[in-house]
């Protein structure tokens, strides 16, 4: 009897997802072909289905609001990592990600190196994946940014990077959140730098 309830739950949520997608399409309108491609890449079907699953589990979830807050988190985490403040990073990162960040911060401190990072701008923040696994929502974002990254030694001499060069950096960050938790914050659970 329990499996028949699960079957009906799946059907029920699939119908809700289909309804939400149809409503979104009617509200958002159609492209004329003259519009520029925007960063609302979450309109693709598999990604849209994942975002819809998250919205069903967390009715307060808004993809545009998520990207705005994720961009702010990206800026804050990059700046805080460069400043070497592990204590401020800890509540924002999973245990594994925090361990990697803390290790890099400690390694810099032992060598008396200083990382100077200037995030010039976020060119694009693009949804790559969104899904639900049990109660946990997971979203993967691809950030294309312009940054100046310089590492200085204990004498203030540049040992890595160029203070006059703006580099394009592509990062993929994965955020997760327990949708049944009263804590509204997402946690950074994975990072990958492509360039």
Segments predicted by a language model, with ranges:
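Structured, amphipathic secondary-structure segments that form assembly/contact surfaces
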Residues: 91-195
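Generic detector of bulky aromatic hydrophobic side chains
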Residues: 5, 19, 53, 81, ...
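Juxtamembrane and targeting peptides
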Residues: 2-72, 76, 151-155
């Amino acid at each position: 009897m329990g499996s028949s309830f699960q079957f009906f739950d799946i059907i029920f949520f699939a119908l809700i997802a289909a309804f939400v997608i149809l409503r979104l399409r009617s509200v958002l309108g159609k492209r004329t072909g003259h519009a520029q491609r925007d960063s609302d890449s979450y309109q693709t079907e598999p990604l849209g289905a994942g975002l819809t699953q998250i919205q069903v589990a967390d009715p307060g979830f808004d993809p545009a609001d998520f990207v705005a807050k994720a961009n702010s988190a990206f800026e804050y985490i990059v700046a805080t990592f460069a400043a070497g403040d592990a204590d401020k990073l800890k509540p924002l990162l999973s245990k594994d990600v925090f361990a990697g960040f803390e290790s890099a911060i400690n390694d810099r401190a032992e060598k008396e190196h200083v990382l100077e990072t200037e995030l010039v701008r976020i060119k694009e923040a693009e949804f790559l994946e969104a899904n639900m696994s049990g109660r946990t929502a997971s979203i993967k974002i691809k950030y294309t940014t312009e940054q100046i990254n310089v590492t200085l030694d204990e004498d203030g001499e540049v040992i890595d990077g160029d203070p006059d060069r703006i580099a394009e950096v592509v990062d993929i960050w994965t955020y997760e959140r327990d949708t049944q938790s009263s804590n509204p914050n997402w946690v950074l659970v994975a990072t990958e730098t492509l360039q």
